[in-house]
Structure formats: structure tokens, C-alpha cells
Curated annotation (Swiss-Prot):
Pfam families: RecO_C, RecO_N. This is DNA repair protein RecO. It comes from Dehalococcoides mccartyi (strain ATCC BAA-2100 / JCM 16839 / KCTC 5957 / BAV1). Keywords: DNA damage, DNA recombination, DNA repair. The gene is recO. Involved in DNA repair and RecF pathway recombination. GO terms for biological process: DNA recombination; double-strand break repair.
Amino acid sequence: MTKPHDFKTKAIIVRKTKCGEADRILSLLTPDLGLIQGFAKSVRKTTSKLSGHLELLCYSEVSLARGKAIDTITGSQTIQSFLNIRNSLQLSAMAFYACELAYHFSPEEAANPALFQLLLSTLEELDNGSQPELCLKYFEINLLASSGYKPELRECANCHKKLQATINYYSPESGGVICPNCRNTQIGMPVSVNTVKVLRYIQENSFSSICRLKINREILSELELAIRANIRFVLEKEPKALFWLDSLRLADL
């Protein structure tokens, strides 16, 4: 979608970078333009009228003027600020992690409405307090799918035979779950029958449906190890927000 000289767009602020003494460069995830960068002049000054509308996690309607190197933000109005998330360290860490992933999985100026809606829905569900751990798993699995990395969960990702109800192996390098026979030639971590079932259910159902799931800590741990390995494989690095999220869990905050 071609941008006019002056334009408005709904956007989620997924990243902010200091620039000069009082300015910022903001990364905005939009439904129609994909990931775009915006220059926010003097937004770090206490007198700035825009600062409260351009914070990380804000869902806002943003006005921009097209520039040669970068667009300039000329106005912004908050649509949703997710106050419950901001008032909780744990939820904030989860939301920042989701925003970081959305940033890394979004090529600049390539529209991905499904990814935008996925992030917005995830922030709304986290703000509502609806099973935050499952909410994050739902986001991660569907993020992979909407970005072209949907893991194979019903047949072996290597030999393509139907998976049997036994211990199988999750292999990001192979593109999903592999069978015990292929484990001899491929790298993979063990996943139980129930973990694979939960992965399938999350991948194939709405968030309102997965909220009804009752998952024990062992399955949740297997899910986390598998999905994190997949994300790390795609990004070729560990998301920075994970360190904060894990430290809060260890401190039980």
C-alpha cells in the first residue's frame, strides 16, 4: 500500500529508540502498512503533548508526514493503553516480549493484517487477565503460523508419516514434530502425546476456546521449551525480553 504525503494509521507501538536529546524513533505495527518507523520530535520533553500517546504498548491512531528517510509523527490519539498490563510487572514483561517478537517477525512496510490482529488480541486478552501463560503460548504458535513458519504437528515433519500416540520429538530444524525413527537422523526434543495434542488444539482453535483448557505444569513446560526453541531457530537469537520475563518468574513476582 502506497503512503500519501500525509496519512493516518492505527498502530501499536512495538519499539522505541532514543534519538538526540529529546527525540525518539518509534516502530509502529499497523494493519495496512506493516511495520513502519516514525520520528517523534521532542517527545521525551515533559511538555510534549504526544508523549502519553506514543508509549510502548499503546494502541493509537497516529498521524504522519512522509519524509525522504523516515516519516515524522505529527499527531497521535490513544485508542487503548492497556492499564492492567502496565500495573503488573508480570503482564508487562509478557506484553513487551510479544511486542519484541512482533517487531522481529515483521518485515518493514509489508502488510500482515493477521499478525497485527494477533498482537492486538493478545494485548487485549493479557489486559483482561485471561490465562496469561496460555495467552502467550497462543500468540507464539500463531505468530509462527502467520509469518510462514507454521509447525507440522499431525505427520512427521521429516518422513511425512502420520504421528503415532507415543513420545515424539519437536524439531525446529525439521519444521515441526518428528517421529522416533527420524529422531536418529534429526535433532529434536521429546514431547509427550498430551503436549502434541495441546499444540494442535492451540494452533487450530480460537483463544476463547483454549481458555477452557486445564494444563498441568509439566505440559506447559514442554510447550515452552519447544516453542522457544522454534522461535530461537527462526530469529537465530534469544529475544531480550525473555530475560526479564524469566527473572520475574524466578522471583515469583
